Amino acid sequence: MPGVPLPFVVLLLLLLLAGTPAQPFPRDLAARSTVGLAATAAYPRFGGLRGDNGTARLGLDFQRMLRLNGTLLVAARDHIYAFDLRQDRGTLYPERHLTWEPQDRENCAMRGRRQDECHNYIRVLVPRDAETLLACGTNAFSPLCRTYQVGSLAQRGEQISGQARCPFDAKQSIVALFVDGSLYSATVADFQASDAVIYRSLSPGQAPLRSLKYSSRWLQEPHFVQVLPYGPYVYFFFREVAVELSALGKVLVARVARVCRNDRGGSPRVLERRWTSFLKVRLQCSVPGDSVFYFDVLEAVTPPQSLHGRPAVLALFGTQPNSIPGSAVCAFYLADVERSFEGPFAEPRGATWTPVPEDRVPQPRPGCCAGMGPAAGVVTSGDFPDETLLFAKEHPLLHGAVRPAGGRPLFTRTGTRLTQLAVDTGAGPRGNQTVLFLGAEDGRLLKVLAAAQHPGGTPGDSREPGDSGNSSARTLLLEEISLYDPGRCHSPRGAGVPSRVLGLELHPPGRELIVAFAGCLLRLPLSRCGRHGSCQGSCLAARDPYCVWLPSRGCVPFSEDLPSGFQQDVEGSLGISGTCQGAAEDSDEDGDLAHDLVPGICRSLHKVCVQAGIPRQLSTNPAALAHWDFFPFPTMQVLTSQNKPWDHLAGWNFVEKLRIYAGQSFKKVFGMAGNGGWRGHCGSSPGFDQKEREKKEFSFLSARIRR
């Protein structure tokens, strides 16, 4: 602005910024589609071996699962199950299993444990090499480990102690991973669960290495979530009671810690057989604003993913246990995680923790790897000066925190505790879409299309329902799926919240997801494209990266073998928002009439229901449902007219809707009146022939189906 003094411009800018309203807390996204239990009831599930009375009585007691190519290994109570995911997608039953029961249950009971606790809960299941895996179980509070063949599940070699490699109690956390032939594990190492440990063992020619014992500065009641290697380090993700916030009470915070892969422990004087490189820093997932809102309880962390072309991890966080329920997903670039370990150290000063002045930090800098960077002249970790080792022993915590990519969460949800996270960063025909699958404590699954733009970018204009107010206008809650059915998923005793999702495992080649509860496993497709039937508008407006519109076949799941010419509108650039009459609408919980696991069913059912023209008002208006609910439609005749085995679907809600609408149309065609439904009007008429009535009904509906 020529002629205007610079101070005036600065003052004007400050006034404008001061007048800018604070950014509101992100509103919950409205689900574009909800799928009820009636629609997911036919998904394959597994709750135990046929004839296994123990599992039938006690429940499956799922612990963890591991996918190795097309094989899914599931660890549970006293069993490991192997599922071949390349076989029939309409079933979920193990092709192999092994039984590993404890031998000393009496000693467990003498320690005051309940009978149902004195089993072998298999808590560790990690690949050791291409042919073998390590399994560790609680073994009635006396943990043991065994090596098994991946293919046959045959035991290899002798069993070894599981102490510090597996918890004593199934409720205690554990993460484990083989790196460079060594087992890195993080758990508790004693019966009382007072000795939390980060441990390296089974190293050829090396003594085991562990964290400092009984040190609240190192570990304070940790709950371990993930372990992964990256560069010269191994990273551990966990939550713990914050020692630096003890003045506020028992506050949980998320952490990421790291150790050097070449760490050999300290000198005989300081940190002998203890980590010399152990450092930890806070992991921060928060909503920015005048008053920052933190999600501190770390629940899940993905393996490294490619996010916007950069290595990153995505993590699921929740609010404090005594707080209002809420959850958030944040992404962290691994370069930012690495950089955070170069920050200042923290130490207590009275009731607060403050940064350590740089001139008080010894050299080589504590936490460095021997032979690298500032410690390039140090041959092994035992050669570090005592001053460096003593400082590392007393100062494991770094000041500050790792901030999320974009400065804010990718997705937030209030009123819900989300428990598990799986991520597909290669969704869509071009493999450039990121989809989050989030399991909840109440048994639901959320399917979220993450923002295509850089996280935390300026939200764009969007007129989609529920889009505004979140971290990005392009983040969409595609589906909200109800999965937990207490009548079909037997809950083990002491399972806590039986509806809590305990595990999610993606199987991209099969375009499916395995969902684990304490009492059962479910196998479901990544999409429900068939619910849109022959409605192009509904298919494209769904903005599901797994669904495409093919003129010759309708709305179908994308696969590499599809012919060219399909359409998709994930970005919403076409502005399509309408649906066709009869297509399953966004919030129609029973609109998912079938799914892609049973070939042929989906399209035939949509042909029946779409052409029957079930209007939305009948599916959502209780008065309309009550008005027409008594029409005695001959369900099996009509459904078998499609030459399909429909018997197992006879109780689905869509059949009731078909009865309702067919009854209304039938009444109009034959000029009948009355408000009691077909049965109320004619069912009691003297001399009415039941067979003749069914014949007319069948002929009428068949005509509607064929037209």
Predicted regions and their residues:
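Short cysteine clusters
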Residues: 369, 539, 547
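Membrane-proximal extracellular "stem/stalk" segments
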Residues: 512, 535-536, 542-545, 586
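Charge-rich, intrinsically disordered regulatory segments
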Residues: 515-516
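Short, intrinsically disordered, charge-balanced linker/junction segments flanking boundaries
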Residues: 5-8, 591-607
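Extracellular Cys-Trp
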Residues: 545-557, 575-582, 588-591, 597
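Disulfide-stabilized extracellular ectodomains of secreted/luminal proteins, especially beta-rich
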Residues: 2-510, 520-523, 531, 536, ...
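Single-pass type I membrane-protein transmembrane alpha-helix
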Residues: 599, 603-616, 620-623
